[in-house]
Amino acid sequence: MFEYQQPDPRGHFGIYGGSFVSETLTHAINELKAAYAKYQFDPAFVAEFNYELAHFVGRPSPVYHADRMSREQGGAQIFLKREDLNHTGAHKINNTIGQAMLARRMGKPRVIAETGAGQHGVATATICARYGLECVVYMGSEDVKRQSPNVYRMNLLGATVVPVESGSRTLKDALNEAMRDWVANVDNTFYIIGTVAGPHPYPMMVRDFQSVIGKECLVQMPEMLQAAGCHTTQPDAVVACVGGGSNAMGIFHPYIAHEATRLIGVEAAGLGMDSGKHSASLQRGSPGVLHGNRTYVLQDDNGQVTETHSISAGLDYPGVGPEHAFLKDIGRAEYVGITDQEALAAFHYLCRTEGIIPALESSHAVAYAMKLAKTMRPDQSILVNLSGRGDKDIGTVADLSHADFYCRPSCKGQSVKGADNAQPSANQQVVKVAQ
């Protein structure tokens, strides 16, 4: 078995992680560390968390054998961990419940969050509505356009959504603004970070809350694999998309000790890995400090963070969780890239072969699984973390596919990142909706 105990007591994953924050936030971070240490294994806290996952979220989420896709692709059997079936439509709710429970116990009546694809914002707004907490969500204005259905969902749930106009107007900038808010309102505000990044203890804490995904898979997979005629009791490979990396770490972490299972993170290659328009921090970045932790960062020779690109708002981020950086360096996980076009093709393919509409983020993982399956035997298996559903992306996909659809952003005079470079696939039909 692979020996693995990370992070160390100071929150370091090898040379990565740590806590690089202003003096104003030092007390808040120390307070959070103490609270998490107190409640992490507290029986009442754990029981409440498990109750919420079962009765509010609807866990466990099922594992589905995508048998038609497996037959058509040839090679390995492909299984999907259906996080898209969770309440709010993605894996994000697993983490927001745990952090909101901490906020209540710490006496913080106000919650802030950042969001890219909008799923973390929706999940935060949802649990704040349930617990009666004030909720403010920061979102890059570019992502507000791309993910307008989720913006309205947040408003319905009582959250205030603040569009961020600085920088590239995407996830990085939303996180910057949320950090500024936290500094200004540290006494009464709890910051629910949505990914496995940020200062310690966030990378560890978010990973722990999300690891329910992989823990369920360890129980579910033996029966699924046996029924499919596979040769092992656990998958040969686990594949997940990586932006900040919370869904990937949630499914990877329980499998780290299983050396026979490959862990493969899929980054957004955008317009191509050599185009300069991508979000592949682990493959094209270098070690640096971003948003309170040391990790791989897309930066220029002067250490300035560079702009990123992806059709998926949730992957459009110039950094990555420090544990992913560590797993890459020690060789326990592999990281690959999928382009906008490959992800868009996988989105349409999964819709039409399995009747599942995936998020554009998840489509990157599906696209790589389709490639990988062809190199494997039929008695081998790939487990894909289908991290979210694609309802939020319908308008964007319509623009990217040049389809005639009534709620395309371009119909509202808005442009979508990547639309000028997207071409419809050969078997793609134009969808016309009656007006």
From Swiss-Prot:
Q: What is this protein called?
A: Tryptophan synthase beta chain
Q: What is its EC number?
A: 4.2.1.20
Spell out the family assignment given in the record's similarity comment: Belongs to the TrpB family.
What pathway is it annotated to? Answer: Amino-acid biosynthesis; L-tryptophan biosynthesis; L-tryptophan from chorismate: step 5/5
Task: Describe its partners and assembly state.
Answer: Tetramer of two alpha and two beta chains.
GO cellular component terms, A-Z: cytoplasm
Enumerate the GO terms in the molecular function aspect: tryptophan synthase activity
InterPro entries cross-referenced by the UniProt entry: Trp_synth_b_CS, Trp_synth_beta, Trp_synth_beta/beta-like, TrpB-like_PALP, TrpB-like_PALP_sf
Cofactor(s) named in the record: pyridoxal 5'-phosphate
The gene name on file is trpB
Which reactions does this protein catalyse? Answer: (1S,2R)-1-C-(indol-3-yl)glycerol 3-phosphate + L-serine = D-glyceraldehyde 3-phosphate + L-tryptophan + H2O
Q: Which residues carry this modification: N6-(pyridoxal phosphate)lysine?
A: 92
